[in-house]
Amino acid sequence: NGSDFAVSASVNFADTQINGTHWTASLWANDEPATITLPRDGNYLQIRISCGQQANVTIRDRLSAQNIELSAGNGTLTADELYGHRITLDATDGRLSATLPESADQYHVRATANWGTVIMNGTPLVQMDELGNGTAQYDNRAEHVPHDLQARVSGSGQISLLSQIASTNADTPV
């Protein structure tokens, strides 16, 4: 445990670095879930989280930063809420799912897949089958929106996103 974060689990740290608005940690959980708690009042420029090997990572709190980078690799990464100006999501053969706090029309969305699928609000944006059939690239070409979202699947994995639905009542979640 440190003064700027807390960890609950049996974990081994290879590296921890807190430098102003950047926090980096490399850790291994020992056959049990690990929970990392960052201060709520933190004003982060960048948050970068990746799953090693076939790890299973769940983020149960809102991640808020200028830039958010999440990578599921070959594991499973679930994020409850991502709030950032620039969001980059990657999966190889793993699965990444995340909730976005605003409606889809507030994001410039670009998605690519070599074989896997990127889904937003239940609709496939890119989806390739074993024969290479399907759509490999998607760009909603949204301009002058507050958020930039890039989703890439480089293997047979999947990225699934759920955003708020644009409506007259902004408090109604999907």
Which residues make up each language-model segment?
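Right-handed parallel beta-helix
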Residues: 2-4, 8-80, 133-167
